[in-house]
Amino acid sequence: IPTLEDALKAVAGRAGLLLELKVKGMAQQAVEAVQRVAFTDPVIYASFLHDELTQVRTFAPNAPLMALFGRLPRNPVVRAVTHGASHVGLRHDTATHRLVEACHRAGLLVCVYTADNPRDIQHGLSLGVDGVISNYPERIRTATK
């Protein structure tokens, strides 16, 4: 089983990463792994566990952070800003034009996830999002041609 460091070395110089922190208490280890391998491509730390983003900020003060939302809280923009996020990740089926605009007004970049079929990719793009997260990046390339 490859480690995070193995994965970082494998993509170094070829791609940036969206590094999702799925387990509480992993922020420091993730940041240290990125630093140990001297990974110089862009890394966005993302999590549904928003306190993990606050922890990342402790160890990597300038790192881009993405607050991921499944079910939307009352005010996702405030929640993201409170945790120091620079990006917001919204489920493709919960994102709305109004919410994307509110995020942009707050200075947040917006991505939709996990848009795997062309219809969902096009929907996300039509909302004016800054990025689309997919298990099939070639479909995004096709949709944006």
What are the residue ranges of the model-derived segments?
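C-terminal active-site rim and adjoining tail of enzyme catalytic domains
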Residues: I1, M66-K145
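Metal-dependent phosphodiesterase/phospholipase catalytic core, i.e.
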Residues: I1-R71, H83-H92, H104-A106
